[in-house]
């Protein structure tokens, strides 16, 4: 079995080992009175701790922590398990008190594991078949504790703690490097492949055996067939296709689609009553909407069962398996995270020795995910979070055509849909009660532009036992509601986020206000500019104003239409007041959370935005809601790359909320059109939607006009300084569309390669321009997308032999 922790840590100095050997841990239940060797005790401790930790990933941390706290003198493994449980709650919820508890618990683990490491290194070499050097199991626990404490330190609001975190990170990497070197030595001695090779070979037509002896449960791991029920402790084999397609594939596309659809359809949402105490039970509540076959990968073999001839098959001893899966999970997560750091910060990290490697990190995480233990579960969660979360923001990804023609058999490029669906299926079977996997399942549908089905699934999930998981699911629902243009659900979801999570109330209030602003504008425009009767309902004529338009009405001439008008005006008044209240409340809650002693970028964005609107309202003598220019909800769609999730119908509808006549004051429109940053916000939002609708030429015309603005006109004061950088980024996306879409290539086949080369170079130049842009509020948000784009462009250029 095994446990987890990708990147975290604690104290700033190496714990001093105790003068004498550490005390023997209290024997686990069932072995009292039995004399056990040190090796047997260690195995018992590991097994007991891992059994408890399985509950964490099944949405039941209370059971896990209750079990782990039973030990009067807990082992390093039990302390690590307890630390992981509290740590996960702290990073999922960003709650200060939970972070403090996590820091204390992880510090205890750090000290104990160091002492056990020193003690273990003094022991005689093990004679029970272990391959790793003595003490390695405690060294990896120590490294995991350092990594966890490093993450918690970074999340604290102190710059000093953040600097300590980097020191812990260096220590953890040094420990992991030594363990990795030992693993490499073992691989060479045993004549196996590199320990850092691809853990999943390309699927073949022959299926491997699905049953392993208990003592071999960690070797030759594969995923079982989709219709088999899997225990969380059972050996589960995993093989995936190496990428979305392979150049030597002979399978038919229809087979791929049918296989993947069947696997996703096989996923079911268990009833909570059936999964509260039984991790392995997969109770059925409802069928999951299937994914469209039209989004299936290019021709290539679907994920099948076969021997995953990875280096992991070499390790059969539980302690070795724990170390092997942990080092892959920890090192892999570090490599992946460091590879996604925005360019400016990555250069700084490189100076002090922190360099990421996305390809290496992903390979290591896939290798760890093959193991049915806590390390494998964490690796799986990281992989799915990366592909369905972070990669969902990326625009510059290799086309399926280029992957099929250029990728190596063991190369993971872009979004490996088949792998992810298979991994998700296994995790759902292994941990049927966990809301995390259900949320990932909904993300798959949302990524297929099936927002309605994804939203329905998120709503079916209900509240998880871990409040932090509920918060994550609710946030995903809230963002999806923005893209679905469902203003009531968008409002209610973000208001609920205030109750569930205290990371950024300013952002939650602001976006909830955006929803009610759109509802106010909807009501005003459905009225056609009409207003309501007098509030006291008197029979006399009253002239009332809605936006710019005044109407006269009398109570005695009410008919069905008048009743509807009255209802709409009542709604307009209500939503206008609510929107203004939420917008004004947002800045008052900003600044409560800081990252490395800096205010959260989105909170700075919110404060500037509201201040700008207030200034305009005062200057024009308007109410706040009437002084707002281009739709802030449309701006949120852009900042979350919502166009990538929306189908053509939703994109066309979203275009309407950007129309100038949606503003409720003509004076506001006239004023806004004089402000370059506001005009640019309107134009970039429109261009992004046009790009996703396949209307790139129209988008390019808008963006070229915006790019001609002087940067100085969009800087200073409360102006939105990110918008010109984003316009340049959008131009890069249009160039990439030209690279990847055959319908945009020259009709003369001889000219295609040169056309693609030039467009690739153009995309790279534009991305480099954005990467080197001066600091702006949302630079980190765009930085990750830019870094992913640069990596993709370099990959294609290298494969094609082009010089950038």
Swiss-Prot record:
UniProt cross-references to InterPro entries, sorted A to Z: Iml2/TPR_39
Subcellular location: Cytoplasm; Nucleus
Any one cellular-component term (Gene Ontology): nucleus
Start-end of Polar residues biased regions: 10-32, 191-210
Region (Disordered): 1-32, 190-218, 232-257, 271-310
Source domain of life: Eukaryota
Keyword annotations from UniProtKB, A to Z: Cytoplasm, Nucleus, Phosphoprotein
Main subcellular location of this protein, as a coarse class: cytoplasm
Keyword Transmembrane helix: no
Biological role: Inclusion body (IB) resident protein that interacts strongly with lipid droplet (LD) proteins. Involved in LD-mediated IB clearing after protein folding stress, probably by enabling access to the IBs of an LD-stored soluble sterol derivative that acts as a chaperone in inclusion clearing.
Family, as annotated: Belongs to the IML2 family.
Subunit-level organization: Interacts with lipid droplet proteins.
Protein name from the UniProt record: Inclusion body clearance protein IML2
Gene: IML2
